[in-house]
Amino acid sequence: MSYPSQGHYLPPEHQYLTAATLASHGHEHLYAHSQLSDSPPRQDLAQRKRPKYTRSKTGCLTCRMKKIKCDETKPTCARCTHGQRECTWPDASSPRRRAPLRRGSIDDRPSTAGSSVSDDSSPSIRNSTPPRRFQMDSPESGLLPPPSARRNMDPFLQLPPVVAPESRHQHIRPRPPPFTPPQSEQHNLTLSPDPSEYCRYDRYDATYAQTHHLHSSHSSPSSRAPHMVTGIRGMGYSPESVHQWNSPPLLSPIESSSYQHYPLQERGMVGPSDNHHFRYQ
């Protein structure tokens, strides 16, 4: 029995690998062949494309309109001759015209400087004009502004001065002067009191006399008179002082008038006060 040689015998795994490698090598070979076959047309397309030209600012007007680069050959450039177009060039005198304009603008500056110098030299004339106006407005010249101008100027001339806040409070709240009654009123107070006070004192004296007479008639003067006096007059009065204020119920008109005026004069000399009225109420 004969066995195959080891060189020709391959296990199945190796056979599979070899097939895969052959297939991959075959695909690579085909891809490279396709690239080689496709490369010449691409190069032809790159050669066929027109070159990109930049815009020229110094070329002819026709190339500027077409936005192509001009070789600036005169009288006709190569682009215009190749495309059979009319080659037009801008006038050469236009830049020369711009230069005189610029020079003229520069030449105009000294004139403005001269005018500024003349303006600087004129302040003496300008400063001399306001005194003339004041002279015309002065009363000595006899020429016064019209009344409408005066009315417009009056509110500014007659404005009140600005007042500080402290002085404003002083203006708003002036301090009242000390009251000094005239001498005639003082004499009237001492000599002749107000007639309304006569009525008050008469009424109080009459009511007090009546109440004291009733109490003295019902009870003895030694037992109840001190209590009544302390209740009405206060703690500083005694029964002896009560008899000074008592008056008989029936008196002649002359005696009653003299009795009424005597205490009123003393009260007027002391001065009017409302404190002694509360004890009767």
From Swiss-Prot:
GO molecular function ontology, one term from the record: zinc ion binding
Keywords: DNA-binding, Metal-binding, Nucleus, Transcription, Transcription regulation
One Pfam assignment: Zn_clus
Top-level taxonomic group: Eukaryota
Biotechnology: The basidioma development regulatory function can be useful in mushroom breeding.
DNA-binding region: 60-87
Protein name: Transcription factor lfc1
Species for this entry: Flammulina velutipes (Agaricus velutipes)
Encoding gene per record: lfc1
